UniProtKB/Swiss-Prot annotation:
GO terms for molecular function: DNA binding; DNA-directed RNA polymerase activity; ribonucleoside binding. This is DNA-directed RNA polymerase subunit beta. Belongs to the RNA polymerase beta chain family. The lineage of its organism: Bacteria, Pseudomonadati, Pseudomonadota, Gammaproteobacteria, Lysobacterales. GO terms for biological process: DNA-templated transcription. InterPro entries: DNA-dir_RNA_pol_bsu_ext_1_sf (IPR042107), DNA-dir_RNA_pol_bsu_external_1 (IPR019462), DNA-dir_RNA_pol_su2 (IPR015712), DNA-dir_RNAP_su2_dom (IPR007120), DNA-dir_RNAP_su2_hyb_sf (IPR037033), RNA_pol_bsu_bac (IPR010243), RNA_pol_bsu_CS (IPR007121), RNA_pol_bsu_protrusion (IPR007644). The gene is rpoB. It comes from Xanthomonas oryzae pv. oryzae (strain PXO99A). It catalyses: RNA(n) + a ribonucleoside 5'-triphosphate = RNA(n+1) + diphosphate. It is an enzyme of class 2 (transferase). Keywords: DNA-directed RNA polymerase, Nucleotidyltransferase, Transcription, Transferase. DNA-dependent RNA polymerase catalyzes the transcription of DNA into RNA using the four ribonucleoside triphosphates as substrates.
Amino acid sequence: MTSYSFTEKKRIRKDFGKQRSILEVPFLLAIQVDSYREFLQEDVESTKRKDLGLHAALKSVFPISSYSGNAALEYVGYKLGQPVFDERECRQRGMSYGAPLRVTVRLVIYDRESSTKAIKYVKEQEVYLGEIPLMTGNGTFIVNGTERVIVSQLHRSPGVFFDHDRGKTHSSGKLLYSARIIPYRGSWLDFEFDPKDALFTRIDRRRKLPVSILLRALGYNNEEMLAEFFEINTFHINPDEGVQLELVPERLRGETLNFDLADGDKVIVEAGKRITARHVKQLEAAGVAALAVPDDYLVGRILSHDVVDGSTGELLANANDEISEDQLTAFRKAGVDAVGTLWVNDLDRGPYLSNTLRIDPTKTQLEALVEIYRMMRPGEPPTKEAAQNLFHNLFFTFERYDLSTVGRMKFNRRVGRKDVLGESVLYDKKYFAERNDEESKRLVAEHTDTSDILEVIKVLTEIRNGRGVVDDIDHLGNRRVRSVGEMAENVFRVGLVRVERAVKERLSMAESEGLTPQELINAKPVAAAIKEFFGSSQLSQFMDQNNPLSEVTHKRRVSALGPGGLTRERAGFEVRDVHPTHYGRVCTIETPEGPNIGLINSLAVFARTNQYGFLETPYRKVLDGKVSDDVEYLSAIEENEYVIAQANALTDAKNMLTEQFVPCRFQGESLLKPPSEVHFMDVSPMQTVSVAAALVPFLEHDDANRALMGANMQRQAVPTLRSQKPLVGTGIERAVARDSGVTVNALRGGVIEQIDAARIVVKVNEAEIGGGTDAGVDIYNLIKYTRSNQNTCINQRPLVNVGDVIARGDVLADGPSTDIGELALGQNMLIAFMPWNGYNFEDSILLSERVVEEDRYTTIHIEELTCVARDTKLGPEEISADIPNVSEQALNRLDESGVVYIGAEVRAGDIMVGKVTPKGESQLTPEEKLLRAIFGEKASDVKDSSLRVPPGMDGTVIDVQVFTRDGIEKDKRARQIEENEIKRVKKDFDDQFRILEAAIYARLRSQIVGKVANGGANLKKGDSVTDAYLDGLKKSDWFQLRMKDEDAADAIERAQKQIQAHEKEFEARFADKRGKITQGDDLAPGVLKMVKVFLAVKRRIQPGDKMAGRHGNKGVVSNVVPVEDMPYMATGESVDIVLNPLGVPSRMNIGQILEVHLGWAAKGLGRKIQRMLEAQAAVSELRKFLDDIYNHDNAINAQRVDLSQFSDEELLNLGKNLIDGVPMATPVFDGASEAEIKRMLELADLPQSGQTQLYDGRTGEAFDRKTTVGYMHYLKLNHLVDDKMHARSTGPYSLVTQQPLGGKAQFGGQRFGEMEVWALEAYGAAYTLQEMLTVKSDDVQGRNQMYKNIVDGEHEMVAGMPESFNVLVKEIRSLAIHMELEE
């Protein structure tokens, strides 16, 4: 049984799972964190770094040599500095969180004169290569002050793929096979058949060439090509006896001869009969070695080599010629004794390469190279060198072509080699053997006689011949995951390659002018490439920070889109579909609805990537029907060979599979197998789904479409004021909250020393304290009321009290949407399924007023409003409270600097920051001149451009930040904010130091009390040190004590050193912080000052807000009804929410009904415990009742709770926390059964049907029949009516058409579209229609006139010409058609 930690003892979930969990839920952000850690390799020494990430990129580009080869720049190592600002400061200042990268390079200059390349001089130096973004602990990046996530990409793995066109290319429907070699970077190489069965190649999808041109360019001639691809039949030509064939009986199978096939006198096959496998066996048994054949059997066969007259050297026939009767006569005449022909047939030995050679115009290697050059560079005149270099650079140089380790592994496996290692370029023995450079010699020496290109063509012809199968590109063995680290590495390499070009140019100067490495390298291209990737790549996304779950799922997302991936428009149905290999790797449920469906997926709970980037999933080993606890991770490729049982396969107490036939999966099919043939078994029932889907209880009872919506909508839940744990969960809520990073978890065990709303101080256990200056105190600062990316509120609340004993990993503080360390997205509401006066028609939701009253769904949203003072052409803008033509009342919330006070309650239209902008001198009217002369008005040369609260928003100002450009004097408010911040930091540091100091003294006291002293203040030699004596001493005098015991003396010395070290450290840290607070801010060009105001907006639930359960049962609130009108139960308790029962059957999400039943039981059990506590029943009675709840099930693997671990006090505390309901967990696919739900209802003294009689709140009459009632975890989604509703009076118009803009952001109007016009036409409402199309839209004069008329009290309108009609006329004129209106 498990032992429970301090946090877990507070509230225990009753778990209905039958499967013992073999694996704990892994760290959910591992894919992000591990990938980036491997990229940086920050904590690894330079010499021990693996060939990954930054190190690999730097190694691949360096050394850079000059064109002459006399100077080289070599890479030694790199190190990352410390970030200038920490995460919090970066968020506040809008900076990027990163560290400077410093690379050590060595410049080597060789002596020109010496022949042996003697070194003239060497210079080593550190070079700054820009800022590298750092990942926060939660797997995000802070770019320009906002948190972003780099989503992993699922792309086609490099390697070789074989495919066919599914008969779509040619009208006959013939399958045309093709092969494609895809490198990690470099040119693609395709091979394809055409309808006439000739084989072609394409490079980078350009014009196709016969494949023999490529082989000829590699150095093969016709004979060699034919010898590679065909087996050869040898015929002996005797001048007298006709022709003899060297017989290989197998090759005759399927042929029909026009002569009898005989062994001696015995005829085996008669003429005209087809030769079968039986005949072949007879021939083999008879041992016939040669076969006399008539001449016409040889005619028409294809020669495998050139035939030459031995005496004269005359060429009689070329290889690949068909033998004619004339040639056969010539062979006899010339005394040719044997010829070889290609063994081909129509069935399984096609003459493909032979056909191809016939259409190949080239004869020599050079011609072939030139032909390839012409195809790649049309229009450029080819030279021999250019053609050779181009061809070599395409596939055979390490700079331009890289298959990568993954590509090489996939390539070798696909062409059937055992070895998975090899070169990252395409290798061809013959090609490299003919070259003379060092690299080629090394390659030839290291490798056997292989040719990558030839082997691919061989496999392709085998597939065309009917042996072998094409690949499935949607198989997860052919798609791999590219995570953050790998993408960052690629981008970094691109930046380095740009630098390399520039360095090469400058290196030649370095030889003569003695430049240093720093002067050679310009870091800008690297920094720019990285900045561009993290700031604006398609896969660098603004983090979804609605709630902890949405953060976790965003980081676990896998996208097929992005650079080097698919595009939405081109992605077909197959790519988006669920594939058998998704099982346990990618969630089969969670994917967006809409155009991205199936292209964006989520990792399954236990999935991880292997060293090659393929997804793998864990399985338990099964040996001879016995299931072991050994776990092995298999990728989709490895899984193909094994039979795998489901997680819920029945086992006995000894872990033996009990069924005669076990349901299994094998090669993507489901089948039944005896236990002895099973190799593996699933680890957990929730293995197939993602985190979001695994949070849906009773998922197994929901239709997949609704489960998808349920999983997706949980991510949109807004954190409520007080989070409530779900009464019915699935047991992984704690893991999600833990890994999301929104809670505060103890880094080390200890005792809570001090606590307030913003800070928790832990005195660490002796055993966990490190050496050196570690004082054994951990201080956790909590996040208070900050804004998330989605404008929701992030706030942490402490959960512990002073004196609590905690262990490592315990939850010390809850964040948004967490409740005692468990994910809590919504509220547990009492729900009744019944219609109520049509208010729940079509998925509408009826709410009780009590829900609003108790603030169950009240959420806090934090809006950030920014006011920027710029330097304009007419002079600087100014932030001040002195604004022209504005009443005193409008300014009463501003201080003298013109900035709103903290705590002010503001409404739409209120001024928050006063700002004036200079305007050009306008011509004054005589009246204005007179007024100016009398009153001396000066303020008219500025206009009011203050920051006002936008329409539809009201709230309380909770924070103001003022940023001032360097070199500009700070205003009073800025100075005040600065002083407050310095005070806060000083107090924080002082407190921290005081706590540390106290901890050190307390430890010292325990180490010296009772020990004998050799002297000290008022202490004689030989006296013992007592507590009373120490209390009477000043703390600083403790260090004067001289102890007899060496350990005690050491302790005093160590304590003194520790205190001094900490004092120094705190002073340095404070000075650093103070410097950062007081320094000017780095603002955008032209910006003098920036003020940010944060508003807290309280949003109560109201009609129009969208709500949902966890089963895809979404709806919109239609009405809020007084409590007394809601249906109520016999106990007098009224329900909170009334849902429409018709929303269930057609949607097939029955999970919600089961959840409601179990939730009612959970709540009922809580009430029962409450009654026990109120009656002050004996603890033993409570213990027995809890035991009844938790341990009623006697199944082998049932999850039990050992209540004997709880002291009476802990048990009472547990009971108090269960009053609100006993939380239950029904894991996905392993949940509570109907019988168990009934048993829980029975324990709670509730009807087993889960239904009860309800009474109408308005009349008091009972309803006709009983109603399903119970508790469901219901969420409020971030689609609030306040954010969507808006109204336009007059506002901006489109520039060209002069029609009103659309949308809330533009303060736009409602479009009166085509169909609405038809409706008015149908009614014959001509005047209304005219008004809609003219003065209310784009008749400029008309609408201005209308305004004047309304002001003057004349209610009439004159419709003129709509502006859009003028636009139409002008467009027609632009087509040179003169069109004008007759007056």
